[in-house]
């Protein structure tokens, strides 16, 4: 299937924000481990979060998707699976990484595997830290990469972990740490990639009753025995998914309002709004909606997006329509995502006519007259959505395999159709 995107003029549109993918994953795991029942209201039901839900069900957790919510019967810190379990995490790095540490809370071995691309995504630093905390971790294929077999128990103690490839290594251990036999203390020798997601992890843990102490992003300590407690929990809107909607106003001109976002959220992808404002858009955050409006020309900027990785491609698409070059830094770890996002973005923008320079940790886009092209998203939802938005400004864009957006924003195409943009 192919979605064809034509050029459109200035917009005046309003969209509801999809529920947060990151919060939904973490709330599912906290609810599954908790004492008692948890009701998760307004969860994101997408390919990624369904993989986490199915993984928890494989571990023996009763879970039911209901209209507008998920009901989870917590296992009080011990997964009741009757024997060894193999969990297929598909192309969800979040599912595989977060469940790797939680698997130590099963009474039986757990094997985590996934798609061919997943088997190319490293988990060595996470495995090393889990071994230091008492886990038995074995790679059944290439050392340092899935499939990964988890057994033993989470004793706790101290470990050093490198989160420079992914902060999910750190989040994985933190989420399971309340159920370790003793307190868990993690030291991070390098600045973690996507560090704002550690704020999301800590937020969910605290709301479910865990006790966590931290020194910035350098050291974390989780108290053993302060278990999660089942609760009613509402998932906030997703700034990552909202970035595509805001970008429509930036590339086409006009105004877009997105409802359902927390204006004080710890989500790092809120920084995308700062980038749009610096480029010349006006941003207004109210209690009911966040509104982006563009009435004049955009200008290029220099910005560090290391804590907002999921909006880098969206920002690159916007930058291609500006009046001067944009340099985005903090991009090194994007090669380990669902695709090599920097490489795919650079190649596609060059084919469209833009000038692009790539270094180990940066992406510079020099605007030039653009034309539409066929886009192969490489099964990466964020690539498909970013270039669909750019297509609204350029026209002649053909997005292959559009169903890949099901991973995080299942209603993306319908949202654009609903506002007459496709």
UniProtKB/Swiss-Prot annotation:
Keywords: Amino-acid biosynthesis, Aromatic amino acid biosynthesis, Cytoplasm, Transferase
Principal cellular location given in the protein's record: cytoplasm
Pathway linked to the protein: Metabolic intermediate biosynthesis; chorismate biosynthesis
Catalytic activity, as annotated: 3-phosphoshikimate + phosphoenolpyruvate = 5-O-(1-carboxyvinyl)-3-phosphoshikimate + phosphate
GO MF annotations, alphabetized: 3-phosphoshikimate 1-carboxyvinyltransferase activity
Annotated catalytic residues: 310
EC number: 2.5.1.19
BP terms from Gene Ontology: amino acid biosynthetic process; aromatic amino acid family biosynthetic process; chorismate biosynthetic process
Localization per Swiss-Prot or TrEMBL: Cytoplasm
Residues bound to 3-phosphoshikimate: 21-22, 26, 166-168, 194, 310, 337
EC top class named in words: transferase
Binding sites annotated in the UniProt record for phosphoenolpyruvate: 21, 93, 121, 168, 341, 382, 407
GO cellular component, one term: cytoplasm
Subunit description: Monomer.
NCBIfam families documented for this protein: aroA
HAMAP family according to UniProt: EPSP_synth (MF_00210)
Known function: Catalyzes the transfer of the enolpyruvyl moiety of phosphoenolpyruvate (PEP) to the 5-hydroxyl of shikimate-3-phosphate (S3P) to produce enolpyruvyl shikimate-3-phosphate and inorganic phosphate.
Family, similarity comment: Belongs to the EPSP synthase family.
Protein name as catalogued: 3-phosphoshikimate 1-carboxyvinyltransferase
Species this chain originates from: Methanoculleus marisnigri (strain ATCC 35101 / DSM 1498 / JR1)
Gene behind this protein: aroA
């Amino acid at each position: 299937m192919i979605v064809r995107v034509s050029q459109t003029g200035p917009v005046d549109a309003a969209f509801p924000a999809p529920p947060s993918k990151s919060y939904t994953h973490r709330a599912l795991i906290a609810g599954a481990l908790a004492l008692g029942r948890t009701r998760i209201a307004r969860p994101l039901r997408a390919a990624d979060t369904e993989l986490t839900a199915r993984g928890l069900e494989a571990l023996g957790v009763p879970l039911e998707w209901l209209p507008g919510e998920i009901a989870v019967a917590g296992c009080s810190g011990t997964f009741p699976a009757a024997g060894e379990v193999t969990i297929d995490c598909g192309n969800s790095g979040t599912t595989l990484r977060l469940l790797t540490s939680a698997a130590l809370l099963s009474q039986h071995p757990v094997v985590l595997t996934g798609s061919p691309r997943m088997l190319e995504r490293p988990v060595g630093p996470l495995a090393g830290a889990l071994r230091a905390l008492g886990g038995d971790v074995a790679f059944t294929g290439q050392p340092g990469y899935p499939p990964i077999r988890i057994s033993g128990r989470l004793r706790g103690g101290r470990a050093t972990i490198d989160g420079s490839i992914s902060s999910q290594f750190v989040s994985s251990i933190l989420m399971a740490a309340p159920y370790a036999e003793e307190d868990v203390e993690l030291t991070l020798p390098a600045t973690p990639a996507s560090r704002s997601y550690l704020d999301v992890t800590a937020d969910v843990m605290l709301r479910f009753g865990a006790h966590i102490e931290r020194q910035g992003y350098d050291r974390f300590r989780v108290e053993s025995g302060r278990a999660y407690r089942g609760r009613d929990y509402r998932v906030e809107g997703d700034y990552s998914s909202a970035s595509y909607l805001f970008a429509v106003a930036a590339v086409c001109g006009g105004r877009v309002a997105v409802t359902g976002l927390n204006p004080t959220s710890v989500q790092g992808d809120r920084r995308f709004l700062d980038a749009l404002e610096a480029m010349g858009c006006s941003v207004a955050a109210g209690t009911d909606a966040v509104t982006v409006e563009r009435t004049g020309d955009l200008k290029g900027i220099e910005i560090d997006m290391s804590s907002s990785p999921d909006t880098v491609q969206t920002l690159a698409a916007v930058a291609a329509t500006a009046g001067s070059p944009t340099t985005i830094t903090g991009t090194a770890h994007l090669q380990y995502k669902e695709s090599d996002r920097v490489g795919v973005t650079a190649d596609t923008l060059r084919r469209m006519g833009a000038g692009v320079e790539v270094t180990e940790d940066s992406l510079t886009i020099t605007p030039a007259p653009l034309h539409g092209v066929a886009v192969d998203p490489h099964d990466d939802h964020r690539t498909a959505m970013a270039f669909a938005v750019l297509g609204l400004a350029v026209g002649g864009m053909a997005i292959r395999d559009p169903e890949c957006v099901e991973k995080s924003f299942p209603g993306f195409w319908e949202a654009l159709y609903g506002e007459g943009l496709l």
